[in-house]
Amino acid sequence: LFNPLSIAAALRSYAGESPVRHSELGFDGELWFHYGFHGSFSAPEADQALAAMNAARKSGAEALRAADRIVLTFGTAWVYEHDGAVVANCHRRPAAEFTRRRLGVDEIVTAFADLMAGPLGGREVILTVSPVRHLGDSLAGNAVSKAALRLAAEELAERFPDVHYFPAYEILNDDLRDYRFYADDLVHPAPQAVEYVWEKFSAAVLSEQARRLLPDVRHIVVAAAHRPRIPQSATYREFCRRRLEEIAALPQIDFRTEAEYFRRCIEINS
């Protein structure tokens, strides 16, 4: 999700936990899709698309309930509207079906002020503006878009004590303005720049204790994402057991998903 109104709509849907309904889907002759979801959720059968979308919405609702700190990134103020509603994804539909416009600062602020009074209330919110340029909007169009996002973030941070701004946009475009910090496309940040921004971000929002735990947390998360060449091997079962021991040594961290994965691997391959 790139534009603030689509981000706000997703957060409202998580808070309301209302299921996606068949009437909300579109059909392009091959796939059922939803203007609020990425194309990876589209499917040849409507029930299949609905199942994937509602599973994602349920997961988002659970994450929102559990979160005490939320990081939101505004990517662009340019939006496309279909039948008067802002869409998150155009799904390659004809351009004539959409109206393109730029969100105003007040429009963005109002949407998130309502969220702060509702589902985001009592949570710390960290806002960032994506430093990645949307060149499809032209350099001039990208500049006014980022300006609107930055002004909206500033006003929200001034209005709400639980809202803070992290300057990822300024770090990449001002602090790391040399092109050696950009990838080959000269738009996205290079790995060195990503690591630099991450160091600044973690120092700003994480406690010293949390930063000390990061290597251990990353080790376990990466291990759970690893797909072994021979999952049935005794070596991999022992690998999973060691990861479960490491998880047990960090009871303050929510590793439920990773622990379930390692336990399942041991059971299936025993």
Question: What is the meaning of each model-derived region?
Answer:
Residues L1-S270:
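Extracellular glycan-modifying ectodomains
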